[in-house]
C-alpha cells in the first residue's frame, strides 16, 4: 500500500527525509489463519510506443531542402531532379536511398512476461508472508546484430527477480520480533548506445543521403560490413553516425542487486508504565552493480561516382580506416545504507474521554560508497536527529498535537549544523457531538483540521560538505616565465567552490487547513488548502558577484532564495453496495499548486525589469514575444532591427516585439533585453484524475483518467537543415510552413532555410504550446470464478491534447526523447485459501 504525507506535522518524525513530503510503502505481512492463503499470478504484456513524431519521406525531404536552397543567400547545391525522381520511383536503393530509420530500428510491439507466487499465513505466535516474482521483457528495438553477421544479439533483454519475506514472531506476551528480508536482482543486456540516443538518432537522420549499408565489393576487399555514411560530418574520424551501425556494433550487460534487511523489536513496557511501548528498527541496504561493455568501430562508405543509366557506382571511405576488433571494458559500483531508529510510545485513555499519546524518536542513517575515488567519498555520510510528538483528544471531538524535530547535517558548519523544526495541529470532529445524532444518517462524518509547522532541507545539490572550499591545484591561473623556446608555464591553485561558513538550513513554513466530509456512509470528500513559504533556498551566486573579487570560475553557494507555494487538494471517494450483485465505486483527485519566486540572486536594479524572475513561477519561460511572421520587406524595414539575433530577417522569418526599459523607452533593437517571462510552468499547476470501478456478479470493470493543465511546452531543436547534424524533417513542418507561394503569416513553421537561422531558432512565444492533456491511464476488465480470475488491462491507452506533435507527457524539447509506452496486459490469477 502507498500513502503520501505532506503537511509539517505528518512529516516531522522523518527529519530531513520529510522536507519535501513522504511516501510510505507498506508490504504485506502474515495473518492468523487456519490455512495459508496461496496466490499465483501469470501475466503477459504487449508494449508499444504511444506517439512517435512522423518524419517526412525522402521525396518530401529533398523538395523541402531545395526550397531552402533556393533562397538568395544560400550557396548549397540542391538535390537533382534525377535523384528526386529516382527516389520517387524506388530505383536502385544504394543510389536513391529512402530509408525510414525508425522502421529499420524499431518494431511495433514488444512482449513481456511476469509471474508471481506468494503465500501468507500463521497463527497467534507467528505469521509470515513470502513472495517470489520474476519478470522478463525485451525492448521495442529490432534484433539486427545477427542479421548483419554478428555473433551476439544485442536487443534489450531484461530479467527481474524480486523476493519479499516478512516474518513476525510473538516471542513473549509483551515482545514481538519482525524480520524482513527483501532482494531485487536485475540482469540487463542491450545495445551499447542508450535506447533514448538511438531513438533520437532515427529522428535526426534524413532518409536520402545514404543507405543503411552497401553490398560487399566495389573496389574494397573487406569482410567487414560496408556501412552507409556521408563525409563532412561530426564523427571523430569524418562522416556521420549511422544509426543502425551505432546500434549493432556493440552491447553491454549490467547486473544489479539490492538486498534489504529490516529487523524490528516491539516491547510492551506496561509492566512499568501502562501504555508505554518501545520500538526499535535496524535496517541495512546493500546496492551493487557491475557493467561490461563490448564495442567495436566500423567502416563507412559513400557513393563517389555513379552512372544513372547503368546503375553502376563507385564508393569511397569516409574518414580513416578503423579496426573492427571488439574492445571490452567494465566497471563496478555500489553503496551501503544503514538506518537505526528507536522510539518510545505512550498511549493511554483517562476517564474514558481523555486520549493522550506521546512519542520520542531517535534516528541515525549512514551511507557508504563502494567506489572510493577521493577523500570525500571515503568518508561515511551521516545524518541523525531526534523528534517528539504529543497529542491529546477529548471524547473523540477535540484534538491537538505538537511535534518537533531536531536534525543535524554534515553540509553545514558546526554553528549551523543542527536545526529545530516545530509543528502543531488542531482538529474538531463535529460529527461526534451529541447534537449531531439526528444529522448523522445524512452527514456521517464532518471534521475540521489545521496545522502549522517548519521543515528543514539540507540537500544543497552541490555535493558533500557544501560549506567547505574546494581548490583545484592544477587550475588555469598561473604564470609563464622564460623567452623563446625556453618559456615554461606553471599552473596555480584556483577556487572551484568558495567556502561559506554561514550556509544553513533551507526552511519551509507550511500551513494546511482541511475538511473531511462523509455523506450517507458512502461518499467521502476531503478538501485541503495549503501554503508553503520556502526561505533560505540554496543557490549559487552569479551576476551579483563583481569580477574584481577574483572569483571567476568559482561557485559560491549561499541561502539566497525565497519562494511561496499555494494551492489545494481535493479527493472524492464513493463506495456503494447497491445490491448483492452490484457494487459501485468512484475515485477522483484534483490538485492545484502555484508557486511564486519572491527572492533570488539577482542584481538589485535592472534597466529591463522584464528580465527578473522575481514575481514569476519557477519553470516559466524567458522568451522573446513574437508578432507572427514578417509578411514583406516593408514590414521588416519599418520595425526594430533584429540583426543582433545573428541573422538578417527576410519575409517569412519570425517577427519579434520590442520591449521598453524601466523608463518606458524603446531602443528599436531586438536583443536579449526584449525577453520576458510568459506562459505556464513546465511542471503542471493542475493535476487531476478520476475513474469508476464496477463489480457485477463475477465481473469487474474499472478505468482511470489522469490529466494535467496550466502547463506549457516549448518546442526546440526541431529545425531541419541548418544544424550540424543531418537533421531529419518532421512531417508537420513540411505540411505547414511559410513559402513564397503560400505566404501564411500564421503558419506553424517559418520559411525554410539551409543556414543556421539564429532569428528563427530563438526561444520565443512562437514555439510555445499548451501542454495540457487527458489520458486514459488505466483500464481493466476481469472475471472471477471459484478462486480463479482472468483479466485484461491496459495503460496509456488514449490521449486527448491540443498538442499533437508528440506525447505531451514528454514535455518540452523536440520530441526525440524515448516515448512513453502503451501496455496491454492479459493474465490469470488463482488463489487457494481456507474458505
Enumerate the language-model features and the residues they cover.
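Conserved SET/PR-domain catalytic core that frames the SAM/AdoMet-binding pocket
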Residues: 587, 597, 674, 684-697, ...
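Extracellular/periplasmic, surface-exposed regions of secreted and cell-surface proteins
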Residues: 109, 166-175, 180-185, 211-212, ...
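A generic structural motif
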Residues: 136-138, 408-410, 576, 682-684, ...
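Membrane-proximal, glycine/serine-rich, low-complexity loop/turn segments characteristic
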Residues: 1-3, 9-256, 264-266, 459-480, ...
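Conserved small-residue
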Residues: 39-92, 193-198, 464, 575-682
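Short Pro/Gly-enriched beta-strand edge/turn motifs at strand-loop
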Residues: 95-102, 372, 671-674, 761
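Extracytoplasmic gating/loop element in the C-terminal half of outer-membrane beta-barrel translocons
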Residues: 73-79, 239-245, 308, 708-789, ...
Amino acid at each position: 500500500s502507498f500513502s503520501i504525507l505532506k503537511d509539517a506535522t505528518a512529516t516531522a518524525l522523518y527529519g530531513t527525509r520529510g522536507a519535501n513530503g513522504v511516501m510510505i510503502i507498506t508490504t504485506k505481512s502474515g495473518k492468523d489463519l487456519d490455512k495459508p492463503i496461496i496466490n499465483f499470478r501469470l501475466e503477459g504484456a504487449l508494449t508499444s510506443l504511444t506517439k512517435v513524431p512522423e518524419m517526412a519521406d525522402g521525396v518530401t525531404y529533398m523538395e523541402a531542402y531545395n526550397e531552402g536552397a533556393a533562397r538568395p543567400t544560400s550557396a548549397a547545391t540542391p538535390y537533382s531532379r534525377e535523384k528526386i525522381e529516382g527516389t520517387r520511383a524506388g530505383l536502385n536503393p544504394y543510389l536513391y536511398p529512402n530509408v525510414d530509420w525508425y522502421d529499420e530500428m524499431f518494431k511495433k510491439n514488444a512482449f513481456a512476461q511476469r509471474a508471481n507466487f506468494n503465500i501468507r499465513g500463521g497463527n497467534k505466535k507467528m505469521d509470515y508472508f513470502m513472495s517470489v516474482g520474476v519478470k522478463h521483457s525485451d525492448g521495442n528495438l529490432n534484433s539486427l546484430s545477427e542479421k548483419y553477421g554478428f555473433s551476439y544479439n544485442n536487443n534489450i533483454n531484461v530479467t527481474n527477480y524480486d523476493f519479499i519475506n516478512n516474518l513476525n514472531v510473538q516471542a513473549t506476551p509483551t515482545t514481538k520480533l519482525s524480520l524482513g528480508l527483501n532482494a531485487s536482482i536485475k540482469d540487463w543486456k542491450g545495445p551499447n548506445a542508450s535506447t533514448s540516443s538511438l531513438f533520437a538518432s532515427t529522428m535526426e537522420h534524413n532518409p536520402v543521403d545514404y543507405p543503411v549499408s552497401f553490398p560487399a565489393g566495389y573496389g574494397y576487399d573487406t569482410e567487414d560490413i560496408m556501412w552507409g555514411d556521408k563525409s563532412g560530418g561530426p564523427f571523430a574520424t569524418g562522416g556521420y553516425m549511422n544509426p543502425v551501425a551505432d546500434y549493432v556494433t556493440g552491447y553491454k550487460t549490467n547486473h544489479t542487486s539490492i538486498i534489504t534487511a529490516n529487523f524490528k523489536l516491539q516491547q510492551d513496557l506496561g509492566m512499568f508504565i501502562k501504555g508505554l511501548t518501545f520500538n526499535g528498527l535496524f535496517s541495512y541496504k546493500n546496492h551493487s552493480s557491475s557493467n561490461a561493455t563490448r564495442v567495436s568501430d566500423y567502416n563507412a562508405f559513400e557513393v563517389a561516382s555513379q552512372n544513372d543509366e547503368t546503375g553502376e557506382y563507385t564508393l569511397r571511405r569516409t574518414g580513416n580506416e578503423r579496426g573492427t576488433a571488439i574492445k571490452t571494458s567494465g566497471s563496478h559500483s555500489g553503496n551501503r545504507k544503514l538506518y537505526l531508529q528507536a522510539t518510545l510510545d505512550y498511549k493511554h485513555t483517562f476517564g474514558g474521554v481523555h486520549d493522550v499519546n506521546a512519542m520520542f524518536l531517535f534516528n541515525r542513517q549512514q551511507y557508504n560508497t563502494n567506489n572510493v575515488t577521493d577523500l570525500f567519498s571515503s568518508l561515511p555520510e551521516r545524518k541523525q536527529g531526534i523528534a517528539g510528538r504529543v497529542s491529546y483528544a477529548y471524547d473523540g471531538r477535540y484534538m491537538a498535537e505538537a511535534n518537533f524535530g531536531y536534525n543535524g547535517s554534515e553540509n553545514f558548519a558546526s554553528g549551523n549544523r543542527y536545526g529545530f523544526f516545530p509543528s502543531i495541529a488542531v482538529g474538531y470532529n463535529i460529527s461526534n457531538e451529541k447534537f449531531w445524532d439526528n444529522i448523522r444518517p445524512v452527514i456521517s462524518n464532518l471534521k475540521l483540521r489545521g496545522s502549522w509547522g517548519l521543515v528543514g532541507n539540507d540537500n544543497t545539490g552541490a555535493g558533500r560538505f557544501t560549506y567547505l572550499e574546494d581548490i583545484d591545484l592544477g587550475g588555469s591561473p598561473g604564470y609563464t616565465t622564460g623567452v623563446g623556446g625556453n618559456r615554461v608555464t606553471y599552473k596555480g591553485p584556483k577556487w572551484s567552490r568558495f567556502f561559506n561558513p554561514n550556509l544553513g538550513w533551507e526552511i519551509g513554513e507550511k500551513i494546511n487547513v482541511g475538511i473531511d466530509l462523509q455523506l450517507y456512509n458512502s461518499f467521502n470528500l476531503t478538501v485541503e488548502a495549503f501554503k508553503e513559504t520556502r526561505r533560505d533556498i540554496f543557490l549559487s551566486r552569479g551576476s551579483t558577484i563583481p569580477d574584481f573579487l577574483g572569483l571567476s570560475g568559482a561557485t559560491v553557494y549561499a541561502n539566497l532564495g525565497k519562494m511561496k507555494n499555494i494551492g489545494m487538494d481535493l479527493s472524492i471517494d464513493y463506495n456503494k453496495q447497491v445490491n448483492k450483485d452490484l457494487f459501485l465505486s468512484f475515485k477522483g483527485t484534483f490538485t492545484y499548486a502555484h508557486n511564486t519566486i519572491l527572492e533570488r540572486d539577482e542584481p538589485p536594479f535592472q534597466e529591463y525589469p522584464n528580465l527578473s524572475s522575481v514575481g514569476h513561477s519557477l519553470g516559466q519561460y524567458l522568451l522573446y514575444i513574437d508578432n507572427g511572421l514578417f509578411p514583406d520587406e516593408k514590414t521588416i524595414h519599418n520595425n526594430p532591427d533584429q540583426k543582433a539575433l545573428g541573422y538578417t530577417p527576410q519575409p517569412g522569418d519570425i517577427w519579434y516585439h520590442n520591449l521598453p526599459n524601466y523608463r518606458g523607452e524603446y531602443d528599436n533593437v531586438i536583443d536579449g533585453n526584449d525577453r520576458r517571462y510568459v506562459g505556464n510552468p513546465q511542471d503542471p499547476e493542475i493535476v487531476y484524475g478520476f475513474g469508476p470501478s464496477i463489480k457485477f456478479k463475477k465481473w469487474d470493470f474499472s478505468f482511470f483518467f489522469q490529466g494535467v493543465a496550466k502547463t506549457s511546452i516549448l518546442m526546440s531543436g526541431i529545425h531541419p537543415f541548418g544544424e550540424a547534424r543531418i537533421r531529419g524533417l518532421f512531417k508537420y513542418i513540411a505540411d505547414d510552413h511559410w513559402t513564397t507561394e503560400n505566404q501564411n503569416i500564421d503558419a506553424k513553421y517559418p520559411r525554410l532555410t539551409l543556414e543556421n537561422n539564429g532569428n528563427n531558432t530563438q526561444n520565443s512565444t512562437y514555439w510555445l504550446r499548451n501542454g495540457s492533456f487527458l489520458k486514459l491511464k488505466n483500464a481493466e476488465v476481469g472475471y472471477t470464478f471459484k478462486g480463479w480470475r482472468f483479466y485484461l488491462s491496459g495503460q496509456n491507452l488514449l490521449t486527448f491534447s491540443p498538442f499533437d506533435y508528440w506525447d505531451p507527457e514528454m514535455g518540452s524539447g523536440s520530441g526525440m526523447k524515448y516515448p512513453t509506452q502503451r501496455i496491454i496486459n492479459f493474465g490469470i490469477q488463482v488463489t487457494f485459501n481456507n474458505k
